[in-house]
A protein has these predicted regions:
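Glycine-rich phosphate-binding loops of nucleotide-dependent enzymes
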Residues: 2-237
Length: 237
């Protein structure tokens, strides 16, 4: 449950790819225990925003994680502070088994986190069935499950997930939504980069809409549903 206490605050975030000015002053925040959706069309800057927060692209501004400015840190340093990132590319180690991939996600073999291997396999029984299979032969949906689970094994306090439902069957999409709600129940903040409006509005506490590489709307799912002009201008194809 959201406490109203700010966990992540982004102030005037700019990002650059070479000489290209991609993000132009993004401002957003995530409260403790909240699911926040970042919506927008392709090219709006959503993926670049989470990459800039992680320190994966050239940036300037402020990124405050529980009051500490992490801008300028390397991605692995940001991760060690408790921010997890699940890219759209479904990065796995294809020649390692499912279980070995999960083992690589552990922060420390000696430290017990919120999540165990059994937790992962209970949420995604298909991974249990295939735990000794090389990850490279998994379906796209199974690889998405594995990427999410491996990130969780690092015990993050906030997880940023880029297009987790892309290309997945409807039944798997709903499974991912339930999974994200379980993260919230366990006290983990979620930043969800998503194009499927229905799923984002179903599970999010608040939403941001991006357009022209900046934030053009902030509000609750109900407020976005009621604002036909914003949806038409910035979301509908």
């Amino acid at each position: 449950m959201s406490t109203g206490k700010v966990a992540l605050e982004v102030k005037e975030l700019h990002a650059f790819y070479g000489k290209s000015h991609i993000l132009q002053g993004v401002n957003l925040h995530v409260n403790e225990g909240e699911i926040v959706a970042l919506l927008g069309r392709n090219g709006a800057g959503r993926s670049t925003t989470v990459k800039a927060i992680m320190g994966m692209v050239d940036n300037r501004g402020e990124v405050l994680w529980r009051g500490k400015n992490v801008l300028g840190m390397k991605a692995y340093e940001v991760a060690h502070l408790g921010i997890g990132y699940v890219p759209e590319s479904r990065d796995i180690f294809p020649k390692l088994t499912v279980h070995q991939n999960l083992m690589l996600g552990q922060k420390s073999a000696k430290k017990l986190g919120r999540w165990s291997f059994d937790d992962m396999y209970k949420m995604f029984p298909r991974l249990r069935e295939r735990q000794h299979i090389e990850a490279g032969v998994l379906s796209g949906g199974e690889q998405q499950m594995l990427t999410l689970c491996r990130t969780l094994m690092g015990d993050p306090d906030l997880i940023m997930i880029d297009e987790p439902t892309e290309g997945l069957a409807p039944a798997i999409v709903q499974l991912v939504a339930e999974y994200l709600m379980e993260l919230k129940r366990r006290g983990i903040c979620v930043v969800l980069v998503e194009q499927k409006l229905a799923i984002a509005l179903q599970i999010s506490d608040r939403v941001y809409v991006m357009g022209d590489r900046r934030i053009v709307f902030e509000g609750t799912p109900a407020e976005l549903k009621a604002d036909a002009n914003i949806r038409k201008e910035w979301l509908e194809v």
